[in-house]
Structure formats: structure tokens, C-alpha cells
Amino acid sequence: MEPLPASFFNRPTVSVARDLLGARLVHEAPTGTRLVGRIVETEAYTEDDPACHASHLSRDPETGEVVGQGRGQDLFAAPGTAYVYLIYGVHWLLNVVTEPEGTAGAVLVRAVEPEEGLQDMRTERGVDRRVDLTNGPGKLAEAFGIDGEFHQTRLTARPLFFADGDSVDDEQVARSSRIGISKGVERSWRWYVAANRFVSPASPSG
């Protein structure tokens, strides 16, 4: 499996979120094991979106430089860069930066269908049932051994990367509002493979 190029992510965030369905998330672990999952659920976030970490930042009208502090600044990185952060002090979440460099945007990978390296995933997660391994963003990060060390790394090169996969027809794709947010709930920016049992069980916001 070869990594998707940066050009795949150098596009509108909503397009990347939709097109990542069916692609593979791959981690070639230090142990020599390859962990692979088929992406079945994503969410999009952009700088004009109140649910985005970069929404509080502004630009200097003369220089165009981003003004403000906080982790949202990392969403202005080059497309294909990892944006990994911790929530509730417990769960790491994997996002990939989108849009041309200097424009904030990212896609959150919410769920994958595990395909390779299942025993390693079970060890990392401490659960046996395949359906419970990666059906949520915190779960998949734990199963794939993804933590803050991957923040700002390039997801267009090994060891952690996205690879081409199966295309998902539009009639197989469902959309909803995103999960776990209080702002921007009117945007149907969550995409998932309908009827796939590895999609996260949480309910959409709103």
C-alpha cells in the first residue's frame, strides 16, 4: 500500500471527508505489524466553522498572518499533516489537515473497519470483539497506537498514512450533523457508510 499524495488533501475539506470513505488508514508499527482499517466515518471542520479549533483565530488585514494563540494554529499547516489532540484527558483523536497551506481545515477520522493487525489492536484496546475495536475516534487511535507523538507528522509518508481503497457509491453514503459538538450543529458535515456496523454508535448533535 502506498500513501495518498498531499494533493489529495489540498482540496476543500468537505470533499476530502467524503472521499476518505473507503480509503485505508495504515500504521506500520515498530513491532513490524501492519495495522489497516477501512475508513467508514469522517467529519469535516473549517476555519469559518464555530465547531473548529481555529474559529477563534483571525488574520492580520495587512500581512494575512494568523493572529491568536492555541492549538488551532496547527490547522493552518500543509495539507496531509496530522492534527492529533487529547480530549477529556484520556482519548487521542486523529485528524488530517486539509485545504491549501495557510487555510485552516481538517477531517476527523471517526471510525474504521479493522482489516489487518487485529490481534495487536485487541491488545492495545483490551477488548476482543472486532466491532468494538475501532468504532469511534478514541477507540481507533488507541487500537492503532496513535498518540500525541504523531501530531504534526506527515500522513503522506510511512509509518502512519492513508492509502487508496474501495470507492463508496453515493447511495451507500449517509450524512448527519457532527457528534459531540454544541456549535455548528446545523452543518451536515459527518459522512459515514450506511449500515456499516463499524460506524460509531454515538448520536449526532442537535
Curated annotation (Swiss-Prot):
Stretch forming the signal peptide: none
GO molecular function terms listed in the Swiss-Prot or TrEMBL record: alkylbase DNA N-glycosylase activity; DNA binding
Assigned protein family: Belongs to the DNA glycosylase MPG family.
Top-level taxon of origin: Bacteria
Keywords in alphabetical order: DNA damage, DNA repair, Hydrolase
EC code(s) of this entry: 3.2.2.-
InterPro entries documented for this protein: Formyl_transferase-like_C_sf (IPR011034), MPG (IPR003180), MPG_sf (IPR036995)
Protein name: Putative 3-methyladenine DNA glycosylase
Any one GO BP annotation for this protein: base-excision repair
EC top class, as a word: hydrolase
